[in-house]
Amino acid sequence: MRKEKLITLNDRGNEMTFKIREMPAMKLESWLARAGLLLAGTGAFDGKEVATPGDAIQKAGAMLSQGGISALANIDYEKAQPLLDDLLACCSRVDAGIEQKMTPETVDGIIEDVRTLFALRKEALLLNMGFFMGGESSVIPSDGTPSPEQSKPRISVRSRR
């Protein structure tokens, strides 16, 4: 069974629940290989031994789990966009028990705050790459009553395996 977790985000005063689901193994391997090739093209692995494609995948996973999405900062956006879209595809909005898949085409009709989009991609990355670093979440538990002065979306997590 794929790992998944439910998170609640405050999107400009609206509490929204999202389900983050782990990518299937083959898709994740492909994602890591593409990320590894893009990172290698930026010189990110210079000075680090990469003898096999598996080494590139391991190094890419380690870089992404340590640096998060910022590890992709030196990659042209057009090349990184499919990777970001794949992370978004791991996310669904859950409302009254109904899941709505997040896609580049639907996201603007669901969320308003770009920080919510960043938080979703970050949590999808953590869920998928967490095994490289032990899978510790960086989310802030929500007590269900966010204050209006909060500058960042608040997140609460419920995990199921």
Task: Annotate each language-model stretch with its function.
Residues K19-R21:
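Short linear motifs in exposed loops
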Residues N10-R12, M23-A25:
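Generic structural motif
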Residues M1-N10:
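Short acidic, Pro/Gly- and aromatic-enriched capping/linker segments at domain boundaries
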Residues R2, A25-R161:
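Short, surface-exposed, charged amphipathic helix/loop patches that serve as local interaction elements
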